[in-house]
């Protein structure tokens, strides 16, 4: 009986032990299952989060991931083309400054090397034309018809580096893979920058300007406005248009004086800003920047009037009447542009470009000029105006009048005189 009782107790203990083992094993399986489920959920959430971030970035349109093949192609092409003008870069006068700035002639020589290899190539030299532009022109015209495709534009920078822009159109959106090639201290080409960005909007004008706005960070992501506007001249200007632009309007521009952004003629010259225009005419005549430190007490009467009369059909008496003149010291006042006398405008940064030249029966020449603005408004003709000039046999010329067409003066900021009576 005692033995039976012991047997029963042993059996009961065994069963209880088995039950406890089974429970422990079941708890272990459940625990492992919960861990696996949690890891799967976490992994799914991370994947979902990464996908959402990628989708969000694509929606923003900037800092897009660059395909490895595109990256390799861009880097290889940049370095290969820079090697074409290595000999020019090595012997070029780079000055002593840490930031290399090459002269225009050297940059144009580099452009010719790339041109001869058959690539579309532009420069940052003002009024220079893109060489081998035809393929880009065709690409943009096809894009306007909704046809997908791609085109690459190269640009020689003023430091001798090379920009590469591959524009890709998928039938709906335009993208650009931008790459910048630079020279290192050993004159070896390298890559400093590469990006992939969507164009927010774009247009190709009849005049041949490719105007576009890149997607960029916007408030509240950034505290300041980032300007993504760009303009690239595709179709070339004629040689005469380039020459007249350089000779007659580049030195003036649209800020600091109002020769090109007001209506006037030989019968109505009282509204011109003579005190403002002096420094620009000085730069045109002498080929160097006006140094105000040489004139601490104002500009001497004879020097001021002589320069103005060289470029305008006006008398010394009229200048003294229209300009701000110091009778006591016999000098004309001058003030540097600053926050107290000038509010910067996008229009003021525009580049004047001669688009047509007409010889008149009276021997004068009428230049049709358009203001090209590459900032924010991104417009290849903010205003169109006709500038009348008379050329002398010795190569000198005088401005005779300016007329802004199509009520364009209503669409630009009022002019600010830097010095007021």
Residue ranges and their predicted role:
Residues 24-26:
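Bacterial signal peptide processing site
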Residues 29-421:
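Mature, Sec-exported extracytoplasmic domains of Gram-positive
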Residues 10-16:
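Hydrophobic helical h-region of N-terminal Sec-dependent signal peptides
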Residues 18-22:
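C-terminal motif of bacterial Sec signal peptides marking the signal peptidase cleavage site
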Residues 1-10:
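Bacterial N-terminal signal peptides that target proteins for export
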């Amino acid at each position: 009986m005692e033995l039976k009782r012991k047997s029963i107790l042993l059996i009961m203990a065994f069963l209880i032990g088995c039950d406890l083992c089974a429970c422990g094993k079941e708890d272990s399986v459940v625990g492992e299952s919960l861990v696996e489920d949690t890891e799967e959920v976490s992994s799914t959430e991370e994947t979902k989060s990464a996908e959402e971030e990628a989708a969000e970035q694509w929606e923003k349109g900037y800092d897009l991931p660059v395909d490895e093949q595109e990256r390799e192609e861009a880097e290889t092409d940049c370095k290969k083309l820079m090697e074409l003008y290595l000999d020019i870069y090595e012997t070029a006068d780079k000055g002593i400054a840490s930031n290399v700035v090459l002269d225009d002639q050297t940059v144009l020589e580099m452009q010719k090397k790339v041109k001869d290899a058959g690539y579309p190539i532009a420069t940052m030299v003002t009024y220079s034309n893109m060489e081998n532009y035809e393929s880009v022109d065709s690409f943009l015209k096809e894009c306007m018809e909704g046809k997908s495709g791609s085109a690459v534009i190269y640009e020689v920078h003023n430091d001798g580096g090379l920009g590469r822009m591959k524009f890709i159109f998928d039938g709906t959106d335009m993208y650009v893979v931008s790459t910048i090639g630079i020279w290192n201290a050993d004159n070896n080409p390298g890559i400093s920058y590469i990006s992939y960005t969507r164009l927010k909007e774009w247009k190709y004008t009849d005049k041949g300007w490719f105007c576009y706005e890149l997607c960029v960070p916007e408030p509240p992501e950034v505290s300041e406005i980032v300007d993504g506007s760009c303009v690239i001249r595709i179709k070339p200007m004629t040689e005469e248009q380039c020459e007249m632009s350089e000779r007659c309007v580049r030195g003036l521009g649209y800020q600091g004086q109002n020769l090109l952004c007001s209506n006037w003629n030989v019968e109505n010259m009282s509204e011109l800003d003579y005190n403002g225009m002096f420094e620009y005419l000085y730069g045109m005549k002498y080929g160097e920047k006006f140094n105000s430190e040489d004139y601490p007490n104002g500009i001497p009467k004879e020097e001021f009037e002589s320069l103005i009369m060289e470029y305008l059909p006006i008398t010394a008496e009229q200048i003294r009447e229209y300009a701000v003149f110091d009778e006591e010291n016999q000098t004309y006042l001058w003030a540097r542009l600053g926050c107290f006398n000038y509010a910067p405008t996008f229009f003021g940064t525009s580049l004047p470009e001669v688009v047509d030249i007409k010889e008149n029966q009276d021997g004068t020449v009428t230049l049709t000029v358009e203001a090209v603005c590459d900032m924010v408004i991104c417009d290849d003709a903010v205003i169109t105006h006709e500038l009348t000039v008379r050329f002398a046999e010795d190569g000198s010329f005088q401005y005779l009048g300016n007329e802004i067409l199509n009520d364009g003066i209503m669409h630009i900021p009022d002019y600010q005189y830097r010095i007021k009576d």
